[in-house]
């Protein structure tokens, strides 16, 4: 029976382009996972959107002298194009500045307030006398009181992952003017997180399938003692509080952004013309929701969002899994947008194809510890693995069939033990590799699939059809038939990671249907419209296609084309110099 799988993906702040650190830790893993489940015929809903609110957007707007809406709409549009080019197949990628999201977020806030889970309290907050304003979270930087990191933000330390209150920073400084702000009293709303301690601990105990890094972080976070969390801010840009007399305050972005998973599911439902179908993913206890995030977002998704759901409506499904990734570094340093030490995805895709990037980032995915992107690693992976092990294998099989078997799948004779051994190994790989994809062990799935590609190379070298055909054409035909079935199967095993070239190989193997659908940019469902990204499924989806090849003899094959191109070694130094030049 098909499974119901929610793929809920972290919402990027719409204040700058996406860099490779973003896509390595969140978007490529989420898309790989979603594509696997679509190949299984499961019912998948993958949603996210641009985070349009919060101080990163207002800080960028003030720096440029434009409105926050100008900033978020600019980068929201760029996100849509980037995800489309990279093949990130969101069923819906929207943003948080929609009437639908306002409505859902305000309903949750109001309900929690009426139930007593949100209360008002006077708070000490940093105030800049020079700028004459309170300084919410990212308007302040300083030294982390826990790890000593000198550039911690007022809401979180990127070094140790702790959530912070700006008032706790050592030597705080205003990001607008650089001066030291002073503490002042202001009234704010707080979420009573301690009220959920027992329920959160019970929930955590059931999540034995979570990654160890996530389990340990959450357990330590709860055992350190939960504290009420502020849920309002003194800003003009954001979602107004739905409490009479407090409409001049807005919701704290960490509180309302996670609500986007629910509101985006509802928006997708509305766009589909089935206003209630979102409940299949949110109320059916058999449905499973997977949240793809970076490790810095663990507390918001593993503690705060579950608590919001518990307090708002206990019939809503809590996160089933949170496969949070560690961080990706770049050429020996952390990614830094302020220093421009980053590889921006639009820039990368202007020079290189998407599948080699997806392949390399999967091979170095920071699943359990930080990892590193290097240009040398990218070039070597492209040339020595993707091209040499997989691309060349496909090309030499297809060109041989085109040249010596009139471009048709050869008619095999009786298969011998070596033929059966290879096909049995690949058939067994569907269960083993499928289980790895399902457990979000994507590096291991890729490793196993590439190991099978090496087995096919060994098989060809042993059988040597280029020699067989001189003396026994039937034996060569059998070898090529087995090899074609092998690469047809491997095409599926690698398709979640390599959607573009797997689709290309699907056509080269004579198929007329498609593995995957289209990713389109179109108006959203609200009057007046806002642009969204939508995945339009292929006609072949909805059934389980995760099975070994049944490619039939006699099928005509189109002229072969190479799947990948070799990268020159000179690329390494050229790209390193480009990176150094832009970061100066």
Swiss-Prot record:
Q: Does the keyword RNA-binding apply?
A: no
Enzyme Commission code(s) on record: 6.1.1.10
Residues the record lists as binding ATP: 337
> What does the record list as GO biological process?
methionyl-tRNA aminoacylation
Source organism, top-level taxon: Bacteria
One Gene Ontology term, aspect cellular component: cytosol
Q: Which reaction does it catalyse?
A: tRNA(Met) + L-methionine + ATP = L-methionyl-tRNA(Met) + AMP + diphosphate
Q: Where is this motif: 'HIGH' region?
A: 12-22
Do you know which HAMAP family this protein is assigned to? Met_tRNA_synth_type1 (MF_00098)
Give the protein's biological function.
Answer: Is required not only for elongation of protein synthesis but also for the initiation of all mRNA translation through initiator tRNA(fMet) aminoacylation.
Name assigned to this protein: Methionine--tRNA ligase
Which gene is transcribed and translated to give this protein?
metG
